[in-house]
Amino acid sequence: ASIQGKPADLRVSVIPTIHGEKAVLRFLNTDTVIDSPETFGMSEENYGKVLDILKRPNGIFYITGPTGSGKTTTLYMILERLAELPVNIVAIEDPVEKHIRGISQMQVNTQAGLTFETGLRAALRQDPDVIMVGETRDSQTLKTSVRAAVTGHLVLSTLHTNNAAGTVVRMLDMGAEPYLAASSLSGILAQRLVRKICPDCKTEREPDEEERKLLGPGIRRIRYGTGCARCGYTGYQGRTAVHEVLAVDKTIRAMIAGGCREEEIASYAENILGMRTLRDDLLRLVDQGITTAEELERLTFGEQRP
């Protein structure tokens, strides 16, 4: 398949309903290379943090977020960058959504006994430098990933959590020992997808009173789309990602091993390490006129930390 002349892989899901079959199509851009922050859809600061985490020789790097937050796309972008290096990369996926030259990709097949966990154990016998596990779905896969990380491998995987600090709690809830979670975790990239304002009908105005409370005093003008034929009169066209990057340091390792709460880890990351939260990153996009205050409200509703 192709989108606007660019190659793309197509994934189709069809289910039967009482009104007939319902189909959902997922397009994955196969022509994107992670060579700049713009390509990756993130700030220079967060991009630099991701590259620093990937330079570490071992540890687990999680990409987290809800379903449909672009985790797979980000994971493939990272793999493509790593594939340019002289390293042995093995990936276990379900399904393989994009073929990447230079990477040994395995397709999960539960009927044949190939699961994420068994594939991961098999990959460890292939002398890998980097292992990608498409999704950490169960405690056994998590524990094997932890063992791989502490024995000198860089492990990339995804988890369903709301923010970076919440990933630590998720690991412990899935059965990881605190001291092993502390020693194995290298970094976390939490992300969401937000809609971009249509460039053809973009306009601006001053925020109203409610929007000022949401945005804070730093943003004096906001942009939005009035709606046009090109965007289907929605005011939006395309999507981009917002990110939250947590690079694990010695203090965070000690906090994890000591059983600190999610809020304490988040507070340290934000106030001491200067981590920009998902909300902070989205405020940046609102200020730049890339997305709207409406998207900020949608993202932060019910997710603000105390």
Language model segments and positions:
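Short, flexible helix-loop junctions that flank or precede catalytic/ligand sites
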Residues: 1-306
